[in-house]
Amino acid sequence: MAAGDTKVTIANNALTLLGANTITSFTDGSKAAGIANNMYDFVKKHTLSMYPWKFALKKQELQKDTATPVNEWDNQFTLPSDAVSTLPVAVFFSGQSNAPKELNFEIYENKLVTNSTEVYIDYVYDVAEGNMPTYFVTLLVYQLAWHLAEPITDQTTKSDYWK
C-alpha cells in the first residue's frame, strides 16, 4: 500500500506532470490549490467507480428502513454513505457464502428497493489515500493530471495527452 500518500502529495504529483508549481495545502491561496481542491474528491471517486477494485470492496448487510417505498416494492434499504456509486457491485438476499447474485431490486437515489427482507451488498467505498496500492495511486495521479491540465495550464493539448 502507498502508506505515505496524501491528497496533497497525489495532487502535487499531478501538478508536477503538468509542469506546474506544487502546493503546500489545498487552502494555500494559490490558483493551483483552489483548482485541485475543487477537483480532487470528484476525480478520486470517479476513478474508484471505474472498476470493482479488490482493495476498495466492502461487503455489508443493509438495514431495512422503517418507511415503505412508494412504488411496487415492499421494502427499502439505505445504501452505505461511504459508497462511491449508488450502483452496488453485487446484491444478495442471503448472507451465506456462495449465495446467488440477485437481480430483483431497483435503486432510487440512495435507496435500494426490493421485496426481500434481507439485503447484503458488495460495493466500492471511498478508500483513504494511505490504503491505496501504488498502481492505483499512479492511475489517480494520471486522472488528476488530465482533469487539472486545462484549468492549470490553459492548454487543451496537455489535457488530451493525459486523457
Where are the language model's segments positioned?
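Short secondary-structure subsegments characteristic of cysteine-rich extracellular domains
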Residues: D28-T47, K158-K163
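Short, intrinsically disordered N-terminal pre-domain segments
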Residues: M1-F26
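Acidic, aromatic-lined catalytic clefts of primarily extracellular/periplasmic carbohydrate-active enzymes
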Residues: D41-K44, S49-T117, I121
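A generic structural signal for short coil/turn motifs at secondary-structure boundaries
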Residues: F26, D74-F77, G130-M132
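An acidic- and aromatic-residue-enriched active-site/binding cleft used to recognize and process polar
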Residues: A20, D28, K58-L62, D126
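Hydrophobic/aromatic-lined pockets within catalytic cores
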Residues: L15-I23, K44, L48, P52, ...
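Internal mixed-charge
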Residues: M1-D5, T9-I10, G95-K163
